[in-house]
Amino acid sequence: GLRQKVQSLV
């Protein structure tokens, strides 16, 4: 989901 995508950035 979006959460996983955001965590991928960090």
Swiss-Prot record:
The keyword Metal-binding does not apply. Keywords: Secreted, Toxin. It comes from the Eukaryota. This is Toxin To64. It comes from Tityus obscurus. It is found in: Secreted. One of its GO terms (cellular component) is extracellular region. Its main location: secreted.
